[in-house]
Amino acid sequence: TTAAQTTTTGNGAPTPGETVKIGVVSPQTGGLAMYGVVDTWWVDHATKALGDGIVGADGKLHPIQIVVRDSQSDSNRAAQVAGDMIQNDGCHMILAGGTPDTIDPAADQAEAFETPFLSNLSPYQPFYFGRQKDPANPQPFKWTYGLLLGTEQAMHIFVEVYKDIETNKKVGMLFANDTDAQGWLDEKTGAPVVLKEYGYEMILPSLYQPGAEDFTEQISMFKKEGVEILCGTNNPAELTNFWKQALQQGFHPKIASSGKALGYVSTLEAIGEIAYGFLGEGVWHPTWPFKDTLTGMTCQELADEYEAFTGDMWTAAMASYSKFEWAIDIFKRAADPMDKETVVEAIKTTNLTTMQGPINFTEPVDPKGWHPNENVYKQLFCAVQWRKGTKYMFEPVIVGNAEATMVTIQGKIEPMQYS
């Protein structure tokens, strides 16, 4: 890449450029509000790191304004605030992260209003295939991109760990009737493909309604079928209710894994000591060997800063910040940061290593590789087991690195213990 040509004023400072506005769709309230806490941290961190702004490829100093709007953990509201930030606030780019419920409706608005959009920490299947007019014949989107996880990656890291414990290979799937489940259970690209490949049997009860409080039907089926491995992606309240009922009703799997809810220690604390041994998705960890591109801070230093800022234990969802690192890299490289077309061209040529790992859109598209389609690069991923901690009640130990081989494994999986 060529260095930016800097235009300067008489005193040697770069010529002032227009303000770049970046809109953030954030679940500040509602069922996903734990993601909102992370957004509040990284917006503060980024604002301090950026100071007066960035020098773009046009040589001008562009101040960065971050606009945050609450999605209220609601998909309709996520779409509304994304549209408002584009039309009323004049945002040049929209960011969203966490789950398909927050990301996908916001992405549809960005596509409709022809505004660059970045996302992370969510499955790419609903983001890419779920938003197609004709899912059987998917076409690239022009404006919307993500550093996203594949449900096949999640299943891969889990089965690589499952095999370390002797079981009957019966996996009970616990999912709500939502877009997450559609991605996970996709017969062509989701969990069924990986389970079959590794010789596991999938036991799938009916999908529960989001926010359900009674899981008797699912538990009964798991017991009847002799399920020894639990796998799901659930909201915190759902998982808490399910697990307490499961133990009351005598369902004791050797392995229990869940996505989404276990990104936060608060979920485990709400369940209590009966949650020791749960297997979760490690989308980030303080021991990862990467640095923040804005400050040069290590992952451990970022975790320490987060704990000082919030008073809470660090969370893997801190990786939500990486999409902002990506956004800044794009605006620095775009020929004209104020021209959406050149911003999109800069997205397509991204080759950056963030605090969450690499994003390389210059790699050839390969459905089975890290760049599975034009709009997605896959994130790194490890399996963590939540154990009794030294500093905190629960601490995640990395037990599998099949989708992040440069990450150090900290221990072997242990079976769930029941008193």
Task: Provide a role label for each language-model segment.
Residues 56-64, 96-97, 173-176, 312-320, ...:
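Surface-exposed patches in mature extracellular/periplasmic domains of secreted proteins
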Residues 305-317, 328-395:
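Segments of small-molecule ligand-sensing domains
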Residues 14-16, 20-46, 69-75, 98-100, ...:
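Extracytoplasmic "Venus flytrap"
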Residues 1-21, 57-58, 86, 416-419:
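Short, low-complexity disordered leader/linker segments with a strong preference
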Residues 100-111, 213-214, 227-249, 323-328:
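Hydrophobic alpha-helical
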